[in-house]
Amino acid sequence: MMLMRRRLACCSREREISIDFDEHEQDKMITYYGLETCIINNQSYEEESGTSRGDGCLTDSLDDDAFSSCSSSKDASSSFSSKWLPMKNDEHSCDGLNLSGRSQHFDAKEKKKQGYGSSQHFDAKEKPGYVYCHLDVEAMKEKFSKLLLGEDVTGGCKGVQVALALSNAVTHLATSIFGELWKLEPLCEEKKQKWRREMDWLLSPTNYMIELVPSKQNDANGRSLEIMTPKARADIHMNLPALQKLDSMLIETLDSMVNTEFWYSEIGSRAEGKNKSTSESKRWWLPSPQVPKPGLSNSGRKKLLDKGKVVYQVFKATKAINENILLEMPVPIVIKEAIPKSGKNSLGDELYKMLAVESATVDEIFISLNLGTEHAALETVNKLESAMFAWKERITEQGSNGKSPVRASWSFAKDPLSEIGRNESLLNRAEALRTQIKSKHPNLPHSFLDATKIQYDKDIGHAVLEAYSRTLANLAFRILSRMGEILKEDSLSNPNSPAPPSCFPSSRDPYRTPERPLLSSRVRHSLTDDMNKADGTETGLDFLFADAKASNSVNTTPSRSSRLWCLSKVPSDTSP
């Protein structure tokens, strides 16, 4: 027995495991200290040309299709260090907790040059920028317990995927902190601390996301071996620090709204709302922006415009990141089976004939559609994306087989090459039309395919990036909306003041947001219409309350709830 214990002594020792990843490449860390400088320097406040500079920064044009990062990086997948040490049983103090999420590292020389800097680095010993107490730890336990339960408090099998639960948690947190943001004013310190703290919790899983890449290494005998080396996941490493920087820029914009020339008046009685005009009575219960009688001063107006253009750049950046993440998400299998196999069935006869006429340009098709409301624009986008998916599937199938799937030997059979070319032509025109619609309606909510991608997504990294970028885009849009209201009041007070730029959205509908610009009549009808009936006024927005036409096709935009939509197949025909 003693001999056996001696032989197994090597296995019974306590070992400390330390795994280092590319420790010799500490300098290859991506930094984002140049992002804010590029965005601010890119503004051309005196010129309305809307062109972009050669450095790749974003422009003020609503029709920009490309988004390039304004960061300076040496390596897209820079190295990082991650150490797993066995945790001792007596280490339970709050001082030893690492709950900060993504740590920030500053280089002394770069900080002296640029003033600030940040890089993504995985270090288990970094301490948070704020102090945790026992209540914070208990709140974190409660939040992660609900995430693991999949929003099913019974602990049964009705919970949602972890990715969807995490996405919903980010959305709910942003709603509780920012809400509809009816005023341009700084956030209270308690809300800012809660936003930073709980976002660190929700982003903490990304600290441990890696991908294995092949690399060569020499052993002790000099032989070259090919091994799989862990690297930071590229999409997380590139996008998350940029989103965090954009987040801080939006918070700083709100913090700067002190000692302003505008203010808000609280109208608290319905009698006062009756005396208002029709346009004002629609939102008399909300804070109303006020400006001095002569209007804003030139310096105050310029300051507001400058901040608005920076926020607009942040809005475009977050929207671009969100769209790129959605493109990487796969279409769920249940949706693939429900989408009509024919693009003509998805588009309908009228829209299909418009795309089939090659002599008509995309601009002419867009004008002929006459999309007066965002509801009509979203419905058209849903049809186009469904048809585009069907055409892509058919092109892929024909290309892999090398022949038409229903090819016949008769002379009058369709030529597979000509059919592929026709499908590609229709696909390109449909994609161009969709881009045109989104450029004219930049605040459209997610289409049906995008919403189902989020609902069925299992990739936690994609879920975090999509939800984070979406909430920041919503916040940037609300800030722009409030700025647009102030500039509108300024133009009413001073007719000589310049008109607000096109980047500021209209404030016609107080319920309009990029995620939910148009609400169903079942949600909005009772409150708004009952108030208007009591006031004896008309809103002039009856067309916004119309219910969508009932349809069994995939053209209906689904709800954000976890309820599954019952989709019926539409029989396909031989037309593309």
From Swiss-Prot:
The keyword Cell membrane applies. Residues 273-300, 491-520 are annotated as: Disordered. The modification Phosphothreonine is found at residue 435. One of its GO terms (molecular function) is guanyl-nucleotide exchange factor activity. GO terms for biological process: regulation of pollen tube growth. The keyword ATP-binding does not apply. It is found in: Cell membrane. This is Rop guanine nucleotide exchange factor 14. It comes from Arabidopsis thaliana (Mouse-ear cress). The lineage of its organism: Eukaryota, Viridiplantae, Streptophyta, Embryophyta, Tracheophyta. The gene is ROPGEF14.
